[in-house]
Amino acid sequence: MNKIISKKQFSEKVFCIEVEAPLIARSCRAGNFIIVRVDKNSERVPYTIAKADPEKGTLTMVIQEVGRSSTKLCDLKVGDEVADIVGPLGTPSHIENYGTVVCAGGGIGIAAILPILTALKKAGNRVISVLAGRTKELVIMVDDVKEYSDEVIIMTDDGSYLSLIHISEPT
């Protein structure tokens, strides 16, 4: 069983859930994913690992409620447990120092690019991140992205968020 450590609601149907999974947290890499089963009667559903914290032994997922399984997971509270988590699965992304890279994501897709842009920055790249969403509220994890980006561009369909954030001056 894997206990839910924290839960944050980004919008009406989008949640950020952090769960205990120490073995997976220590061995996952950018591009890996997990399969979660909420209870013994639930289906197995794949989710992107948005963040892994090897020291805390936790994984963070961003889930959008769209069906029975995702709703069941999003209905859980801090302290509740999921039946099992399998992973890390998939082939990790190839990461090296390319020089300058651009990472783009929109809506909950921002969670999918976060581990990749983090790994690219740690490999010595200059990272430019482009984030988008229908509204300002749907542009998620901005602070997490800023932490590993040299420049962040944020846009929305409705114009409620249009900015260029220079994290550090280019060298």
Where are these regions (language model features)?
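Helix-rich terminal scaffold detector
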Residues: 128, 141, 145-147
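Short, surface-exposed secondary-structure boundary micro-motifs
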Residues: 39, 87-88
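Generic structural signal for buried aliphatic residues
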Residues: 34, 82-85
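Residue-level detector of conserved catalytic or cofactor/ligand-binding positions
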Residues: 165-171
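Extended interfacial segments that mediate partner engagement and assembly in macromolecular machines
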Residues: 82, 97-102, 111
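Histidine-anchored nucleotide/phosphate-binding helix
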Residues: 112-121
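Short internal beta-strands
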Residues: 127-134, 154-156
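Ferredoxin-reductase
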Residues: 1-78
